[in-house]
Amino acid sequence: MTSYLLGSSSSAFPLAVPDAEHVLATRGVDGYRQYRIPALAVSARGTILAAYDGRPNLDDLPNPIDLLLRRSFDNGVTWEPQQLVRTGAGLQGFGDPSLLVDADTGRIFMFHAAGTHSGFFEAVAGLEPKDDVQHADVSYSDDDGGTWQHRRLTAQLKNPGITGLFAAAGQGIQIHTGPFAGRLVQQYVLLMEGSIMAASAFSDDHGETWQLGELIGPGTTGVGPNENKVVCLDDGQLLLHSRATPCRLSAVSEDGGQTWSPLQPVPDLPDPSDNGSLARFDGLPAVHAPGSAETSTWLLASNNHDPHLRRNTVLSLSPDNGATWPAKLLLCPGSSAYSTVTRLPDGNIGVLYERDGYREIVFASIPAGQLTGLLSARPPAAPEPSGLVFDMELRSVTPGRPAVWQNAGDFHVIPSTSDGQWDVQTWKEIGQGYAGDQVLGTREAQDLNYGPIVPGYKAGDILAFTGRVRNPGTEPATGVVLLGPHHNVGDFPPTTLLPGEHVLYFTPSYTITASDLERSTLQILFTAEADGGRVRMERTFSFDLRTGAVAAD
């Protein structure tokens, strides 16, 4: 029996059946309370490289985050143990990896951000004071990822007026054809005079020097870029995709990333403004996967196929250089977030993605035929529901903060209001149910305040959810209300939904109690009611309090 997902375009998406699936990192296992930000690439020797953050808590930079790597020498069947690439110390951390392979030299680059007191929104212009600058760093390896050296690129890339600056996590590219063949290109996100922009950093000397191309601002719809990826087309042009809502944005460069056309929406790829990926189907230049002249225009994309919620990670195929995306496979039907896709040396498609409220980072190897077969044999369209539709997913888990924070070494606080015009719920992952200040403490302080690192849950841990009720019908729905055990009920008052409208719930949160821990399992039930209770929809979550496992139905 084939299972399908009802997409926002009323298409039925077949479920992917991976040849291999491995959980490479699990919250609370192997020394970290949190893992995030998957990056994936294949080296010139055919080694699969999976990089990600090892975090002392959920918070984005600044935070004493470590850069981690796992390698596979057999197309993802088995994996080496987790290795440290770069270690955060004091308040300084290194995060958001992006992998780029120079197929000519074999050198592997791992771009990342570095920060001590400031992240993207708090950073100052210029290069001083160093602790208040968000730095653009790169680590590189000449022995297939075994050992790494580190460089700082901030002075080369940070033009006047730029404050925040970081490499878009996931994967960079090497241009394989055309007048700029051999050029290395890594996408960046930057804050310029209060506006979020994007740009390409590129190198024509195998990574010795780098320069930043022209800035990419809001496109034809007025929506601007954020984390973005590029791919080289068969004629040497570059295609860019950026996270955005309600769908991804695209642009084209004819000069190797120096300048870009205005951003345009990609209706075939709904998106909740989450970091997805873009890659060549044939894997060039690092991978020479089986293909033909026909497939030279084929592209792969991975993202959350939903205009609002981080859920439903879908793998898509374009046969026409990204003009359309007719073939789609559902990789993860529930809570999932960032993803990176690449072609593997054995011809399969590899995806590294976040699952279950950032609890796991998962690698999946999917036979390419499962996706390519959909170009000629597409599944039938699924009917659009006539009544209300209720979606609720686990967004994140935050370790409970004690009533009184105990310092151990350096200490710094970033107020929750420091992002100014930017909604912290949209642009930044921090703990405390997305409502509190970001407390920066050393690794030692976090161990002292959060306690031992375990895969299960503790009293005070915060479970944050995101949800939505939409009305695809023809009649209004009155008194639409979210019921559940969340402590912030007042944030979600009853509402009326006219046909075609929706209401979002970001983020109903539940704090685990000591009495919860007397049981082995915690169940949380959310109910959406409408029309005076005549309409009821439920979503139940089950948390194994010892192992950390999450299930939803």
Question: Where are the language model's segments positioned?
Answer:
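Asp-box/BNR beta-propeller blade signature and adjacent active/binding-site loops
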Residues: Y4-P383
